[in-house]
Amino acid sequence: MIRYCRTTLMVCAAMLAANTFAHGDESAQIRFTTDVVPVLTKLGCNSGGCHGKATGQNGFKLSLLGFEPEFDYQAIVKESRGRRILPGAPEHSLVLVKATNEKPHGGGQRTSIGSEEYEIMRRWIGGGMVAPAADDPVVERITVSPHEKVMENR
């Protein structure tokens, strides 16, 4: 009987862990600098051809490739009287409806509803749009490996 209870408990724990891993931890706080900025970069929003160029695009400017997270946070959350985000209904936020092309977007569709990028943005908005913090991790070094060339020229 004890063995059965222990086995059942282990199976339940494994299923719970697998479910958390597969669906992400919804309670985990999304950080602007380490979670949101990489999404903006991956989708090309802060590239030189889009909102990252010197003049921005259609009244919305981001720092080039996310090098100034505090500037980007202000642009998304505070500029234009906060019209780009709707904390009470994140899925209706302008940054999401433009990125999914639900509302016409000059850059076209950059992501789709339910994608990992979409969910990160939605959870960040719904979670209170936590600002960049002084203790956010920063890149200190990049190492390329291997150090030597491994392919020969022909």
Task: Set out the residue ranges of the language-model regions.
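Aromatic- and Gly/Pro-enriched helix-to-coil junctions and flexible linker segments
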Residues: 21-154
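Hydrophobic h-region of N-terminal signal peptides that target proteins for export
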Residues: 13-21
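Bacterial N-terminal signal peptides that target proteins for export
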Residues: 1-10
